[in-house]
């Protein structure tokens, strides 16, 4: 196992669940044939203990042990409020 903890930065899509948020992580992928860079998004469920996030916030999340069937990330900080 690696010693570094994975951290990602993304935008909160939904905060409707109790103590959970849905974060959209955007990355750029090069098209295999044409070479153009395309935006791709990944949705990740993260744990928000204090329910401090709102939709549209930019947040930093880090990987942790599995907290539920779909949650294995936790909120580190809110970078910018929406």
Swiss-Prot record:
One Gene Ontology cellular component: cytosolic small ribosomal subunit
Keyword RNA-binding applies: yes
Origin: domain of life: Bacteria
GO molecular function: rRNA binding; structural constituent of ribosome
Assigned keywords, A-Z: Ribonucleoprotein, Ribosomal protein, RNA-binding, rRNA-binding
GO biological process, alphabetically ordered: translation
The protein's assembly and partners: Part of the 30S ribosomal subunit.
NCBIfam families referenced in this protein's UniProt entry, alphabetically: PRK05610.1, uS17_bact
Record function comment: One of the primary rRNA binding proteins, it binds specifically to the 5'-end of 16S ribosomal RNA.
Family membership noted in the UniProt record: Belongs to the universal ribosomal protein uS17 family.
Protein name: Small ribosomal subunit protein uS17
């Amino acid at each position: 196992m690696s010693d570094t903890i994975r951290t990602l930065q993304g935008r909160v899509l939904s905060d409707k669940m109790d103590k959970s948020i849905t974060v959209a992580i955007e990355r750029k992928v090069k098209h295999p044939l044409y070479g153009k860079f395309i935006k791709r998004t990944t949705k990740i469920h993260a744990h928000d203990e204090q329910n401090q996030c709102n939709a549209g916030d930019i947040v930093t999340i880090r990987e942790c042990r599995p907290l539920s069937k779909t949650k294995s990330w936790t909120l580190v900080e809110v970078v910018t409020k929406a």
